[in-house]
């Protein structure tokens, strides 16, 4: 109530300048769904390895006005059969939720259909969203470092606030096995960081130089 009442607006334009103009017009008194980020994730899911993952945050509210960004993957307007259909492909939904849930900036919003399913069918993504929510709650603290050196594999790193926190999300759209090196810190040398998403990759041991 009063000054503590939260509001968010929806302006369905994949045009950052128009979205910034909207925020200016309302005096930044409301936040805004980051439609640009949604369309970047949609394009990434459609183009697969032809999409340059280094561009995933380009032309987005979360990159330019992070305190005003409500990040989301899909919603009722983007699902199949709607007038504004732009549903992120299934294979990229875990990547997309890793982006919005493990990033420092933005207020992430889950889509009911991605979590519970649509039309009576149980969502295949609920378990990974639950896992990412757990990682967010326990580990996703501190500053964010985006490792954007390769078009087909990137990493989102949270540096942590104490010895128990910090995480790295590695995202790839390549059909081939890719590698990426992330500097974790020499103080964490010898630690074993667990792979928690159930992929085929093994746990990672931080080397003596603090790299993973």
Could you say what each language-model-derived stretch is?
Residues 1-212:
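Active-site-proximal helices and loops of the catalytic beta/alpha 8
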